[in-house]
Regions:
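N-terminal Rossmann NAD(P)H-binding glycine-rich loop of SDR-like oxidoreductase domains
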Residues: 2-34
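SDR active-site strand-loop-helix element
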Residues: 15, 39, 81, 114-119, ...
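Oxidoreductase cofactor-interface core, primarily capturing Rossmann-like NAD(P)-dependent enzymes
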Residues: 25, 32, 124-236, 254-262
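NAD(P)H-binding glycine-rich loop region in Rossmannoid oxidoreductase-like domains
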Residues: 44-109, 119-126
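Hydrophobic ligand-binding cavity/cleft-lining segments
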Residues: 203, 297-300, 304, 308-393, ...
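A hydrophobic C-terminal alpha-helical subdomain
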Residues: 247-338, 403
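Beta-strand/loop substructures that line and gate deep hydrophobic ligand-binding cavities in soluble
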Residues: 428-477
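A conserved amphipathic terminal alpha-helix motif
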Residues: 465-505, 510-513
Length: 519
C-alpha cells in the first residue's frame, strides 16, 4: 500500500498546473510532503494561485521537447494533466503529438512514473471524439517506456469543473427542459476530493505498474437524476424534464451554449461524450490504494461540498479572496470567469475628500435612524414589501447608532464581517430569490487619496433569481449610485464639521461637484 501522507521530499512535476485539476492537486501534494514543480505554458498564468510561493514554477509546453527536458530533470513522478479540449482545430492530433513528446522526454529524464487522468470508457460503444482522444493519450503514455498509471473518471463533481458547471447552470436556469436522449445515459460521477485523493496516493505506490484504473463514486445514475439531485440539494423545485429524440448531441451542444456560459469549445465535446455510458467496469485500484477514510463520497455529499460556500452565505468571500480554499470542492480565484455559478456585482469606487477615519465613521453608522443615504422612499417601500412577505423589513433598526459588531442586525441586513477601518460586509436577510451582500470599504489609491468602494453582490437562485436581478438592475444607478455619492459627501461634511452626519441626503441626490473616480 502507498504512503499517502508523506512524499518524503520527492520532486513531482504537475503539468497543466494552471488548470482545474492541476491547480487543486498542487496544494494536496504539498500537504503530502512532496516538492512540487508546477508546469504551464506560461509561468505568468501561475502567479495568481495561492500556492505560487511554495512551488518551483517552470515553463512546460507539452509540445516543446526542450522545455520538457528541463521541466522533467530530477523528477520522480510526472503528472500529465493537459488536453486540447476547447482549443479548436484537430484536437485529437494535438493530443496525440503532445503525449508522444511528453512520454519520450519523461523516458529520457528517467522519470519513475507518469500519472494521467483520463476519461472513463464505455464497453462496446462508439466513443465520442473527446473520449476517444483521452483513451488514445493514455495508450501512448503507457507505451512510452515509463510506467504509467491512468486514472479513468467520468463526471467530476466540484465547483469550477466544466462538467459540474454545465450541470449547475442547466439545472439552475431551466425549471422546464426539453432535452435530448442523453439525459438518460448512465453515469458514475466522482467527487473532486476523491479524484485528488487517488492522484496523490498513486504517486506513493512503489510497485511498477503500467495500466489503467477506473475510479468512480458510489452512485450510478442518469444525467436526469443528477439534475434532479442538484435541484434538491440546492433548494430548487423539482425540474420538469421532457426527453425528445430529435436533439442530436451536436444540436444539443449549441443549446447548452445558449443556456450556459460554458464556452462552446468546451461544452460541445462534453455534450457529445454524454451519449456514452460511463460506469466503472472494475475497482482494481483498491488493491493498491485503500478507499478514502469514511468511504468514497456520494453524489449528494459531493454536491453539498461544491455548494457549501453558497449555502453558508460565503459567496462574497470565495469569489473575491485569494486564500487557499478550505476544501478541493471550493471555487478558486483562478477558476474561469464562467465557473462558480452566477454572481452579479454592482461595483462602484470614488475618491473622497476626507480622511479614511471620517469615511469609516459614516460607514459604520449606516442604517437604523441614519438611513441608507439613498432614495428613502424606495427603501421604505422595499422594507414594507419584505415585512408583508414575512421578512424583517426595516423595523429591526440597529443596536447602537455608532458601533457595529459581527452578527449585529442592521434593518434587513446582518453584519457578516468587520475589518475595522477597512471593510463592512453586510448579508441580506430580506426575502430574496438568492443571496445578497453589500460591501462598504475604505481604501487608498497610489496618490494617498481616500477611496470609497461599494459593492452589491447577488447570487441568484434559479431562473426567478436571474429575472429578479435584471428587473432591478435599471434602478441601480439611482439606488446604489445615490448611496455612494451621499456616503462620500457625508464623510466630507463630517471632516469639515468634525462630527458624523446623522441624516441621509434625500432621493439619492448627487454630490455638489463632480466626484473623481478611483483609478
Amino acid at each position: 500500500m502507498p504512503d499517502t501522507s508523506d512524499g518524503g521530499g520527492r520532486l513531482v512535476l504537475v503539468t497543466g498546473a494552471s488548470g482545474y485539476i492541476g491547480g487543486r492537486l498542487v496544494p494536496e501534494l504539498l500537504r503530502a510532503g512532496y516538492r512540487v514543480r508546477a508546469g504551464a505554458r506560461t509561468v505568468g498564468g501561475l502567479r495568481d494561485h495561492p500556492w505560487y510561493g511554495d512551488v518551483e514554477p517552470v515553463r512546460a509546453d507539452v509540445l516543446d521537447a526542450e522545455q520538457l527536458r528541463a521541466a522533467l530533470d530530477g523528477v520522480d513522478v510526472a503528472y500529465y494533466l493537459v488536453h486540447a479540449i476547447g482549443g479548436g482545430g484537430d484536437f485529437e492530433e494535438t493530443d496525440r503529438r503532445a503525449a508522444r513528446v511528453f512520454g519520450a522526454a519523461a523516458r529520457e529524464a528517467g522519470v519513475r512514473r507518469i500519472v494521467y487522468l483520463g476519461g472513463l470508457l464505455p464497453k462496446d460503444e462508439k466513443l465520442s471524439r473527446h473520449l476517444r482522444s483521452r483513451a488514445e493519450v493514455g495508450e501512448i503514455l503507457m507505451a512510452s517506456g515509463v510506467p504509467t498509471i491512468v486514472l479513468q473518471a467520468a463526471v467530476i463533481i466540484g465547483s469550477g469543473g466544466a462538467s459540474f458547471e454545465m450541470l449547475r447552470y442547466l439545472t439552475e436556469r431551466l425549471p422546464v427542459m426539453v432535452t435530448p436522449t442523453w439525459v438518460d445515459t448512465r453515469i458514475q460521477p466522482i467527487a473532486i476530493r476523491d479524484v485528488l485523493y487517488y492522484l496523490v496516493a498513486v504517486a506513493g505506490i512503489r510497485e511498477e505498474l503500467n495500466r489503467s484504473f477506473d475510479i468512480g463514486g458510489p452512485d450510478v445514475l442518469t444525467y436526469r437524476d443528477m439534475m434532479q439531485r442538484y435541484a434538491r440539494v440546492s433548494g430548487l423545485p423539482r425540474r420538469r424534464i421532457v426527453r425528445v429524440p430529435v436533439l442530436t448531441p451536436r444540436l444539443s451542444s449549441h443549446w447548452v451554449g445558449l443556456v450556459t456560459p460554458v464556452p462552446a469549445g468546451i461544452a460541445k465535446p462534453l455534450v457529445e461524450s454524454l451519449r456514452n455510458t460511463v460506469v466503472c467496469d472494475e475497482h482494481d485500484i483498491a488493491a493498491h490504494v485503500p478507499d478514502p477514510a469514511g468511504g468514497l463520497t456520494g453524489l449528494d455529499r459531493a454536491l453539498e461540498l461544491a455548494l457549501t460556500r453558497v449555502r453558508d452565505h460565503d459567496v462574497a468571500t470565495h469569489w473575491s479572496n485569494a486564500e487557499v480554499p478550505g476544501t478541493p470542492s471550493d471555487p478558486m480565484p483562478t477558476d474561469p470567469a464562467w465557473a462558480g455559478g452566477s454572481l452579479y456585482v454592482d461595483d462602484r469606487s470614488c475618491v473622497v475628500d476626507a480622511s479614511p477615519e471620517a469615511l469609516w465613521r459614516v460607514i459604520v453608522g449606516i442604517g437604523g435612524q441614519n438611513g441608507w443615504y439613498s432614495w428613502p422612499l424606495a427603501w421604505r417601500v422595499r422594507g414594507l414589501l419584505d415585512r408583508l412577505s414575512g421578512g424583517p423589513g426595516l423595523r429591526r433598526g440597529r443596536r447602537s447608532p455608532t458601533a457595529l459588531y459581527t452578527g449585529d442586525a442592521v434593518d434587513w441586513w446582518r453584519v457578516e464581517e468587520i475589518d475595522e477601518g477597512r471593510l463592512l460586509r453586510l448579508r441580506a436577510e430580506m426575502r430574496l430569490p438568492g443571496l445578497a451582500w453589500l460591501d462598504l470599504s475604505v481604501e487608498q489609491d497610489d496618490r494617498g487619496r481616500t477611496v470609497f468602494r461599494q459593492r452589491a453582490l447577488f447570487h441568484p437562485r434559479g431562473l426567478v433569481g436571474q429575472a429578479y436581478w435584471w428587473s432591478v438592475a435599471p434602478f441601480h444607478d439611482v439606488v446604489f449610485g445615490g448611496m455612494q455619492r451621499n456616503i462620500a459627501r457625508a464623510a466630507e461634511v463630517a471632516e469639515v464639521d468634525g462630527r458624523p452626519v446623522d441624516v441621509a441626503a434625500p432621493t439619492g441626490a448627487p454630490a455638489s461637484r463632480d466626484r473623481p473616480a478611483a483609478r
